[in-house]
Design a protein with these regions (language model features):
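Helicase motor interdomain insertion/brace
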Residues: 1-174
Length: 174
């Protein structure tokens, strides 16, 4: 095509922000205020469970430092104690329980993977296969399933997607 986008189709997400999503933003913003960090909106829009996945980010380094500071530690622990949705539950992960995504985009991706059965596959079936597809690759629900391009300037995003999507696939496989 003239604009060189002939093979691309933009699909708008139909995922809505839920109250728990907003609550996680508000609580993460409270954490940021305690440590004197700026607004966390851009982080929050990009990934859930920021305190678990923000390795090598100044925000997480400041939170860790504040947890070791007697003056800030109490306020921070109070927020984290009242907001368990800010951190992944080790007990839930160990038990293989479903983990709330707290992110409309991630929730949509996980829903699409579950509904289509794509969690059973190591890769997306080819669009124009050389051979007849079999088993899970031939499932009617896989006909419309497509690869997703995810763009983000944050390094945390691929880590969150890989971790939580892999966990969800393993959970379904059990």
């Amino acid at each position: 095509s003239l604009d060189r986008n002939g093979m691309l189709t933009e699909v708008s997400g139909s995922d809505t922000t839920e109250s728990q999503d907003l609550l996680s933003y508000c609580d993460m913003q409270r954490v940021a205020r305690v440590i004197g960090a700026p607004d966390v909106l851009e982080y929050w829009k990009s990934a859930p469970y920021l305190l678990n996945f923000l390795d090598d980010y100044q925000l997480k380094d400041e939170v860790v430092k504040a947890l070791n500071d007697p003056q800030q530690s109490l306020a921070l622990r109070k927020i984290l104690g009242a907001a368990p949705h800010l951190l992944l539950s080790q007990a839930a992960v160990a038990a293989g329980k479903a983990i709330p995504s707290h992110s409309p985009r991630l929730r949509g991706l996980l829903r699409d993977m579950t509904e289509s059965g794509a969690w059973r596959l190591l890769w997306v079936p080819p669009t124009c296969p050389y051979y007849e597809l079999q088993d899970a690759f031939a499932a009617p629900t896989m006909k419309g399933f497509t690869k997703r391009l995810v763009f983000s300037s944050w390094r945390v995003v691929p880590k969150v997607i890989a971790s939580l999507v892999s966990y969800d696939a393993e959970r379904h496989a059990r």
